[in-house]
Amino acid sequence: MKPERIPICLQQAVMLRLREKLQQANLRLERNYPEPALHYRQRGTAAGTAWLQSWEIRLNPVLLLENQQAFIDEVVPHELAHLLVWKHFGRVAPHGKEWKWMMESVLGLPARRTHQFAIASVRSRTFPYRCGCQQHQLSVRRHNRVVRGESEYRCLHCGTSLRPGEFQKS
């Protein structure tokens, strides 16, 4: 899979938002937290992740390209808040009261835990499986475990083993 190329103007807009919110937080918290490293290598359906020990933010390049302004407005401060909470409070719940306070009171933004971006372009391939009562979709990882004989999955509703293939109504 080839990496997405982020236009320079978009990278600059991301950095501007990051620096604005970091400066705002440093003023309100009376601290001088350093600028985190920023990387565009988040994969899957997550818009971004905050890496606490390495003080870095990883952003999903596909979702950034598809949702530019909303991504910059919401995801960049969201991940920055995780880093700031870790520095300010230590180890706490990821979206707990400290994170909510950081988002709302310090950064002045709504504390939303998840994004609402369309994820069809970043969703992993799934494989059809069936049981006695319905159709199921297994992730690539789970499908490969079945193929290698490492795992067997059962339907939570009827309890029968899942088998590859489409469900046929009788």
Swiss-Prot record:
Output the PANTHER family linked to this UniProt entry: PROTEIN SPRT (PTHR38773:SF1)
Q: Entry's NCBIfam families?
A: PRK04860.1
The UniProt annotation places Zn(2+) binding at H78, H82
Active-site residues per Swiss-Prot or TrEMBL entry: E79
Please name the InterPro entries in this protein's record: SprT-like_domain, SprT_Zn_ribbon, Uncharacterised_SprT
The identity of this protein, by name, is Protein SprT
Any GO BP = response to stress
Q: Which GO terms describe its molecular function?
A: zinc ion binding
GO cellular component entries: cytoplasm
Q: What gene is behind this protein?
A: sprT
Cofactors needed by this protein, per the record, are: Zn(2+)
Subcellular location per UniProt equals: Cytoplasm
